[in-house]
Design a protein with these regions (language model features):
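Cysteine-centered catalytic environments shared across enzyme families
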Residues: 1-172
Length: 172
């Protein structure tokens, strides 16, 4: 079990969302005791709390990128990741880890959102694309991994546990 969280500042106001996201991550820290990673870019902040199952080395650290343009946060498992690795290596991709996160990242880079059609498993994937200044979040077909979304006029936020949203409440 891992945990993901993120906030998109829709109005680009001056509130420091990195501290808010760190507090969200502390609230759900039990989901990923092995590593915690953060990324802030423009009006996006992402975090990942990792329970290292597939590849316990730092090569599976998230948010993950192999080009500093496209970043992924991933919670779950792609059961057929070896099959997808074979398809991607046949067209020239190289892999440095045994992490299905790296497989998902490269599959997205190659096939875009159609990549998710290839995945068998249970997962939630969030992808920040700096080149397009965009973010997508996708769940597996059955929606087996928890994902909660909160949106108001200023923010869109997501978290693996609903209690993480407590951090969105400004201190009095």
């Amino acid at each position: 079990m891992c945990g993901i969280a993120g906030i998109i500042n829709k109005k680009n106001n001056s509130r420091d969302l990195s501290n808010v996201l760190k507090n969200m991550s502390k609230i759900i820290a039990h989901r990923g005791p092995d590593q915690t990673g953060f990324l802030q870019y423009n009006n996006f902040v992402l975090s990942h709390l990792r329970l290292a199952v597939m590849d316990p080395r730092n090569l599976g650290r998230q948010p993950m990128s192999n080009d500093d343009n496209i970043f992924i946060v991933f919670n779950g498992e792609i059961y057929n990741f070896k099959e997808i690795i074979n398809k991607l290596t046949d067209i020239g991709y190289k892999f440095i880890s045994n992490s299905d996160t790296e497989v998902a990242l490269n599959a997205y880079k190659e096939w875009g959102i159609k990549a998710f059609d290839y995945f068998n498993g249970d997962w939630i994937i969030g992808i920040l694309n700096k080149l397009e200044n965009s973010f997508i979040i996708v769940k597996d077909r059955l929606g087996s991994k928890p994902l909660y979304i909160y949106e108001d006029g200023e923010y869109l936020s997501f978290c693996s546990e609903i209690k993480g949203f407590q951090a969105l409440i400004p201190p009095e």
